[in-house]
């Protein structure tokens, strides 16, 4: 099998990734301009990205009595200061606006007898959100002058003189190679799962917290193109219901369940209640022989059983099915919890592209929004929507103010070269290893030497140096891999993306000489927190090597612009 068909497309805006941020950016651009848009989506926008299975709450909302600065303060505290104040504030100021827009599109938001949204805690509101992604996708599909290309896997940016010109990719169903030339490009490809050995093995390995098909393509393409990245060392580890990997917040906030150990002792007060502290506390209780750990649901009111079962049907039905299979309701037994493997995801932590206040990266004309954008943790759904909107608004303004020539007399030659690269991988050459075996080897290395589950999320510099050496060996070996069809070709590039991210992640973990976030970055060589490290750890690939850049913190009242 080989790629024989080619297509060159010219457009005003290319959106890579038709998930939460990408779809909302398209809606905003078309509302504010007549720009032509191409959305390149690896799956199908109807059920792709983090919203594919739905959600049961809007976790970032300014409820009555609160203001945007309150949300900024919450996110800053959770990340222990390492956030971009400008990004958090501009996001927080628009959370309610995008929520209202989603309701207008058809999202069901629960209301009380007074017609007010039903709050869940200080920042959340309840929704019936199983169909939230189809709602968003349907709105995009109705837009004029928007070409959605599903099953198109983008593999490389086209960058000249640090300016984005477009991207290359291939279609996984018909094998067409694409070169898409654009005046502006928005990367909205999500975060990176599958770097570490997961909770569940074998056939169930994709039973994980984050979409297993979000493999960090946007990060990897940016790294290889010389974009500056930030705070990869702030990994995200989710505290989840054991085995089902269902959310714990639904129980903790829905019925006020506390974290308890096997002795019934509440331990969350001992370690703290930030996201990383909740994971760390659970890990420590298990290490010190007081596990397993649970959310204490035993004894809750019987009517809460039904509420919890219904809530999980909107996003994690396996948890409801587990209760039914066991023949015991939540009120009759506590829910066991565990930490997941680490992920790189800018929607929960501050890891991702280093962007200016308008979400433009250090590559001119390339924007990042949602999980792929760094500096702005605790985005959740609405934050990703806002970042898509903010990037879109700046794109519209720049398209008005600037003139562009996106044609290139080498277009056909460049696409021919990319097709040769694809077909070289699609060749019939014998390979000692399969792509899946190589992926498992990568995950084992990261798990053992870069702070995975088996090492209780801990690492030291010697281990990280070994991880770097072994990942580089795997990169060399991956050059011998081959793919039998277009689907396997996608797997090849997903592996390539993950290996690229692993190297950058390792450099970030080495660079921060402190432990600011337990479990997220548990550095045994530097177990204490230090004020000397109240700064961003950034990286940039220069001449094939990863260069570490330290930057000072940016506050809410600053409008940050790149100096390059």
Kindly give the residue locations of the regions a language model identified:
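Helical element adjacent to the flavin cofactor pocket in flavoenzyme catalytic cores
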Residues: 129-156, 160-179, 219, 225
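Glycine-rich active-site loop/strand segments that organize a redox cofactor
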Residues: 59-91
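Mobile, glycine/GP-rich and aromatic-enriched active-site lid/loop segments adjacent to catalytic centers
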Residues: 104-155, 231-380, 385, 448-564
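N-terminal Rossmann-like FAD-binding beta1-loop-alpha1 element of flavoenzymes
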Residues: 13-39
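Glycine-rich FAD pyrophosphate-binding loop
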Residues: 31-53
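Long, amphipathic alpha-helical stalk/connector segments used for oligomerization, subunit docking
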Residues: 400-484
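Glycine-rich loop(s) and the adjacent beta-strand/alpha-helix scaffold that form part
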Residues: 187-246, 381-394
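Core beta-strand elements of the Rossmann-like FAD/NAD(P) dinucleotide-binding domain
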Residues: 8-11, 174-184, 362
């Amino acid at each position: 099998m080989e790629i024989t068909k080619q297509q060159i497309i010219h457009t005003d805006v290319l959106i890579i990734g038709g998930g939460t941020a990408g779809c909302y950016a398209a809606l905003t651009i078309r509302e504010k301009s007549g720009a032509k848009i191409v959305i390149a989506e690896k799956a199908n926008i109807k059920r792709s990205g983090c919203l594919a299975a739905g959600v049961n709450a809007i976790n970032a909302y300014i409820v009555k009595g609160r203001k945007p600065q309150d949300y900024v303060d919450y996110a800053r505290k959770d990340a222990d200061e390492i956030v971009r104040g400008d990004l958090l504030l501009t996001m927080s100021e628009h959370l309610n606006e995008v929520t209202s827009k989603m309701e207008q599109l058809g999202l069901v938001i629960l209301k009380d007898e007074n017609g007010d949204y039903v709050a869940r805690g200080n920042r959340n509101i309840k929704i019936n959100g199983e169909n939230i992604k189809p709602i968003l996708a349907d709105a995009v599909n109705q837009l004029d002058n928007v070409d959605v290309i599903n099953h198109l896997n983008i593999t490389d940016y086209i960058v000249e003189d640090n300016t984005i010109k477009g991207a290359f990719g291939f279609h996984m169903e018909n094998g067409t190679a694409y070169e898409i030339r654009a005046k502006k490009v928005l990367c909205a490809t999500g975060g990176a799962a599958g770097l570490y050995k997961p909770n569940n093995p074998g056939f169930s390995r994709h039973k994980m917290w984050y979409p297993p098909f979000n493999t960090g393509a946007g990060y990897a393409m940016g790294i290889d193109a010389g974009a500056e990245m930030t705070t990869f060392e702030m990994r995200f580890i989710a505290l989840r219901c054991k085995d089902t990997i269902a959310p714990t917040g639904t129980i903790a906030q829905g019925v006020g369940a506390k974290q308890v150990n096997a002795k019934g002792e509440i331990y969350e007060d001992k370690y703290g209640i930030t996201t990383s502290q909740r994971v760390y506390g659970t890990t420590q209780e298990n290490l010190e022989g007081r596990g397993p750990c649970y959310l204490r649901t035993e004894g809750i009111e019987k009517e809460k059983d039904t509420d919890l079962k219904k809530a999980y049907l909107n996003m994690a039905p396996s948890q409801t099915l587990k209760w039914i299979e066991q023949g015991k309701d939540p009120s009759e037994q506590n829910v066991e919890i565990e930490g997941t493997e680490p992920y790189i995801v800018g929607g929960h932590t501050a890891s991702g592209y280093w962007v200016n206040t308008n979400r433009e990266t250090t590559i001119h004309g390339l924007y990042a929004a949602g999980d792929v954008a760094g500096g702005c943790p605790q985005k959740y759904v609405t934050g990703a929507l806002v970042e898509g909107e903010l990037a879109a608004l700046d794109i519209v303004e720049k398209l008005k103010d600037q003139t562009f020539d996106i044609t290139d007399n080498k277009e056909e030659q460049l696409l021919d070269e990319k097709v040769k690269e694809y077909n070289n991988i699609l060749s019939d050459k014998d390979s000692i290893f399969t792509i899946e075996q190589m992926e498992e080897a990568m995950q084992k290395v990261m798990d053992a030497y870069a702070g995975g589950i088996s090492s209780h999320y801990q690492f030291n510099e010697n281990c990280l140096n070994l991880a770097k050496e072994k990942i580089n060996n795997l990169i060399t070996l991956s050059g011998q891999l081959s793919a039998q069809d277009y689907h396997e070709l996608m797997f090849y590039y997903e592996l390539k993306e993950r290996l690229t991210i692993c190297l950058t992640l390792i450099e970030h973990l080495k660079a921060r000489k402190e432990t600011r976030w337990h479990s997220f970055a548990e550095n045994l060589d530097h177990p204490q927190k230090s004020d000397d490290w109240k700064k961003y750890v950034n990286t940039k690939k220069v001449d094939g090597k990863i260069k570490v850049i330290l930057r000072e913190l940016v506050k809410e009242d600053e409008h940050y612009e790149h100096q390059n």
